[in-house]
């Protein structure tokens, strides 16, 4: 091949530069650009789009496109590291099937439930939506509409959604997909401490002597945090790592001791540890006497099923969250049956191993960090299980000090910052307030400038009940934003899909890709992703982080915030509030919901000139909307233990952990000297409770609603893998991640495979009375279940494994148990 001298010099320069970077280029690569002016990449910070760890990344943009990402070396969370998903963030927005225009089901030029998707304008899309919402409101009132949101919403998007639904439509039928992942953690925080979110922080990783993972595969689900545990373990020989799970996974590789237990028996193990602490005189009496009270939970509370379900009808106290005061002696008596022998019989873990674990909690010189995610939260007694672990830490006083931390890890980037802190749950308001409390409603109405009585005091429909109401025709207009619940939620065939396809209902899905949810909807709205908009997230350690918009969205895609605000412009106050309420605020007569909720002198208080040049949402509204929403929202928590810094501050730092008082973040809550809200002289102050005392709550073992039988003889557990996130909407569109793990597999014990004449790679039918899926078996690899259990991840849209999951919930948190249901495995010839 001939090459000119100019071409040779150019190629040689490129090859020399590549060699320095450790990359080999072909000598004929003459099309490479070597001018720095043409290759300059602009870098800016943003929190990662995936899990709740809250890693900060540097985002590289060029020519209006994200071209690279890297770990942020200035970030205290990840210290320059990323997991495999984080390294490919630059590709999540550029899938070939990105939805770029609204798509409405149509036939003969008109909307038709049975029609095919066709592109329409934003005006047609939103006008059609508004027509359907008005019809549902007229037919059913505020309960006739609903919204299912996300722990991936930005703080501002979630806050705007809460205002639209609870203040605008006066409907509490809004819930986030965090109901599926964090509701049990929230429930236990509120019951035990009277205030939500962890008291510890990530600094605990560098201070603990023992780590105990309760139903958490951190090696794959929180890999950056796992590196901190690994570093602590490998750098300090005395440190121990304990992993409890119903099956072997990658976190066991570092563990000093692994504990495989029978599904649901974690309740017995936790009660045994409490009993061991008492029997071995390891109670920290000074702490317990000064800082705790004892309660007994109501038992036999059912499983959150439909009222006419035979399993639910057997419960003596269905859905009861009542507690009664008890003495320490009564508490001692309640855990006494959970001996090492009894707990071993129930769990399958040896007595010796159980005692090994209990000793680490009981030793006053050992700082213990307990960590958990879905194994504990996705549990029909998840609130109880969370509380039982708090009991252990409270009995020993191992709480809210460096290295002593019961720590609930979150799975989504803003499950804390948006779902929990903003209050996008059907029963909550911002800053831990609830709709059922008249004082909380009054505070919210005052901040939002609403007439008295606007907010509805009855909690709305949570995630599972929303499905049932759609199926029953009680919710007729429904908006799904920033999640893929048709794939992620339970009992798809029986409850959810019939509701989506109910002819009475109009379903809207806002998403960047044609997910299973989008394909089951009637209208798809194309959504801006991640750095295509400005926003803020809140991570698992209470760290709030903000970012600027860095590129424009593809096609006609708009942010969820823009969609919510534009939709609100289509409703006059008289159409949604009714004459009686409008009469209390005659100045609002004739105004739109947009005028009342978002042009209220607070949200629109900051001029467009304060925003960055690239801020499509601010330009659309004519004011700095993100700052206005954030500052109005922050007013709920300031002075009430949820203090946030001024919005602009978050653009100059790598996040701050609330409460932020006088510019200083809080590392350990409830501890005098660390938490500004802890009273002087208190030592510990659990100020979420009126008397400043946390609760030690007695709760027994109770069986799951279904167990294996002769026909359905195997346990099924669902979950995630390292390479994919949730339903794979983003990660399956990254070629490298898709190629690494293209298909979900059924991980099965070799003995169970042999019984069924199965070999690795064989296709099987996994079935129960709710449905069936086809999947290939894997007898080796990262996940190794014990005999009697199979594990199947839920990222694969071709294998909707969650259709097999019963929509049973923890009756207190309303969170579904995705970790245990009976199935049978049949070989496909």
UniProtKB/Swiss-Prot annotation:
Protein family according to the UniProt entry: Belongs to the prokaryotic molybdopterin-containing oxidoreductase family. NasA/NapA/NarB subfamily.
Compartment annotation: Periplasm
Record-listed [4Fe-4S] cluster binding positions: 48, 51, 55, 83
SUPFAM superfamilies, per database record: ADC-like (SSF50692), Formate dehydrogenase/DMSO reductase, domains 1-3 (SSF53706)
GO biological process assignments: cellular respiration; Mo-molybdopterin cofactor biosynthetic process; nitrate assimilation
Native organism: Aliivibrio fischeri (strain MJ11)
Subunit description: Component of the periplasmic nitrate reductase NapAB complex composed of NapA and NapB.
Signal peptide residues on this chain, from the entry's feature table: 1-29
Keywords of the record: 4Fe-4S, Electron transport, Iron, Iron-sulfur, Metal-binding, Molybdenum, Nitrate assimilation, Oxidoreductase, Periplasm, Signal, Transport
Function noted in UniProt: Catalytic subunit of the periplasmic nitrate reductase complex NapAB. Receives electrons from NapB and catalyzes the reduction of nitrate to nitrite.
Source lineage: Bacteria, Pseudomonadati, Pseudomonadota, Gammaproteobacteria, Vibrionales
PTM note: Predicted to be exported by the Tat system. The position of the signal peptide cleavage has not been experimentally proven.
Positions bound to substrate: 794
Protein name, entry field: Periplasmic nitrate reductase
GO MF annotation: an example: molybdopterin cofactor binding
Chain positions recorded as Mo-bis(molybdopterin guanine dinucleotide) binding sites: 85, 152, 177, 181, 214-221, 245-249, 264-266, 374, 378, 484, 510-511, 533, 560, 718-727, 802, 819
Cofactor (UniProt): [4Fe-4S] cluster; Mo-bis(molybdopterin guanine dinucleotide)
Pfam families: Molybdop_Fe4S4 (PF04879), Molybdopterin (PF00384), Molydop_binding (PF01568)
GO cellular component entries: membrane; nitrate reductase complex; periplasmic space
């Amino acid at each position: 091949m001939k090459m000119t001298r100019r071409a040779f010099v150019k190629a040689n320069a490129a090859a020399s530069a590549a060699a320095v970077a450790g990359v080999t280029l072909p000598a004929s690569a003459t099309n490479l650009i070597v001018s720095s002016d043409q290759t300059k990449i602009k870098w800016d910070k943003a929190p990662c789009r995936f899990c709740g760890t809250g890693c900060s990344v540097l985002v590289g943009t060029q020519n209006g496109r994200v071209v690279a990402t890297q770990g942020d070396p200035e970030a205290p969370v990840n210290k320059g590291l990323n997991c495999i998903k984080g390294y490919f963030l630059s590709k999540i927005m550029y899938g070939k099937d990105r939805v770029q225009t609204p798509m409405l089901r149509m036939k003969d030029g008109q909307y038709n439930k049975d029609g095919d998707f066709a592109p329409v304008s934003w005006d047609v899309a939103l006008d059609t939506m508004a027509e359907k919402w008005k019809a549902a409101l007229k037919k059913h009132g505020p309960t006739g509409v609903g919204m299912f949101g996300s722990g991936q919403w930005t703080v501002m998007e979630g806050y705007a959604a809460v205002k639209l639904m609870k203040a605008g439509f006066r409907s509490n039928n809004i819930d986030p997909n965090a109901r599926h992942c964090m509701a049990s953690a929230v429930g236990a925080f509120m019951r035990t401490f009277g205030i939500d979110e962890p008291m510890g922080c990530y600094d605990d990783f560098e201070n603990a002597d023992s780590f105990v993972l309760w139903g958490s595969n951190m090696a794959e689900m929180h890999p950056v945090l796992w590196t901190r545990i690994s570093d602590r373990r490998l750098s300090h020989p005395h440190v121990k790592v304990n992993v409890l799970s119903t099956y072997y996974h990658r976190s066991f590789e570092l563990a000093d001791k692994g504990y495989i237990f029978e599904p649901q028996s974690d309740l017995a193990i936790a009660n045994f540890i409490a009993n061991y602490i008492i029997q071995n005189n390891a109670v920290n009496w000074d702490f317990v006497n000064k800082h705790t009270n004892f309660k007994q939970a109501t038992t036999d509370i059912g499983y959150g099923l439909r009222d006419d379900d035979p399993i639910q009808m057997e419960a003596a106290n269905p859905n009861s969250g009542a507690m009664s005061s008890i003495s320490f002696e009564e508490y001692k008596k309640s855990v006494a049956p959970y001996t090492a022998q009894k707990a071993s019989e129930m769990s399958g873990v040896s007595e010796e191993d159980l005692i090994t674990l209990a000793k680490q909690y009981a030793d006053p010189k050992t700082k213990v960090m307990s960590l958990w995610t879905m194994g504990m939260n996705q549990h029909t007694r998840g609130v109880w299980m969370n509380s039982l672990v708090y009991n252990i830490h409270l009995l020993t006083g191992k709480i809210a000090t460096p290295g002593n931390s019961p720590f609930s890890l979150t799975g989504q980037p803003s499950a804390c910052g948006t779902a929990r802190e903003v209050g996008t749950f059907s029963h909550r308001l911002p800053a831990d307030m609830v709709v059922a409390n008249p004082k909380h409603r009054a505070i919210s109405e005052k901040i939002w400038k609403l007439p008295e009585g606007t907010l509805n005091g009855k909690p709305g429909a949570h995630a599972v009940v929303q499905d049932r109401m759609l199926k029953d025709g009680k919710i007729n207009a429904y908006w799904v934003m920033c999640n893929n619940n048709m794939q992620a939620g339970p009992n798809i065939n029986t409850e959810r899909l019939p509701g989506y396809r109910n002819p009475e209902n109009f379903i809207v899905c806002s998403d960047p890709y044609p997910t299973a949810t989008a394909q089951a909807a009637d209208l798809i709205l194309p959504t801006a992703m991640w750095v295509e908009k400005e926003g803020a997230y809140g991570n698992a350690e209470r760290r709030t982080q903000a970012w600027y918009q860095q590129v424009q969205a593809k096609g006609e895609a708009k942010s969820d915030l823009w969609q919510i605000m534009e939709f609100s412009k289509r409703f006059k106050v008289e159409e949604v509030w009714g004459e009686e309420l409008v009469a209390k605020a005659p100045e609002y007569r004739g105004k739109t919901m947009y005028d009342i909720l978002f042009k209220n002198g607070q949200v629109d208080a900051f001029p467009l000139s304060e925003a960055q040049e690239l801020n499509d949402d601010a330009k659309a509204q004519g004011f700095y909307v993100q700052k206005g929403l954030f500052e109005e929202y922050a007013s709920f928590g300031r002075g009430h233990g949820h203090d946030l810094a001024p919005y602009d501050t978050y653009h100059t730092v790598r996040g701050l952990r609330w409460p932020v008082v006088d510019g200083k973040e809080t590392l350990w809550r409830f501890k005098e000297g660390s938490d500004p809200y802890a009273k002087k002289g208190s030592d510990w102050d659990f100020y979420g409770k009126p008397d400043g005392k946390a609760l030690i709550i007695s709760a027994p073992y109770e069986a799951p609603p279904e167990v294996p039988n002769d026909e359905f003889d195997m346990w099924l557990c669902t979950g995630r893998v390292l390479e994919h996130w949730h339903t794979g909407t983003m990660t399956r569109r990254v070629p490298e991640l898709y190629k690494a793990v293209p298909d979900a597999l059924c991980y099965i014990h070799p003995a169970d495979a042999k019984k069924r004449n199965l070999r690795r790679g064989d296709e099987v039918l996994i079935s129960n009375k709710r449905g069936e899926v086809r999947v290939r078996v894997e007898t080796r690899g990262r996940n190794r279940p014990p005999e009697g259990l199979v594990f199947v991840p839920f990222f694969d849209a071709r294998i909707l494994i969650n259709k097999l999951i019963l929509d049973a919930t923890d009756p207190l948190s309303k969170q579904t148990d995705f970790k245990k249901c009976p199935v049978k495995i049949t070989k496909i010839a």
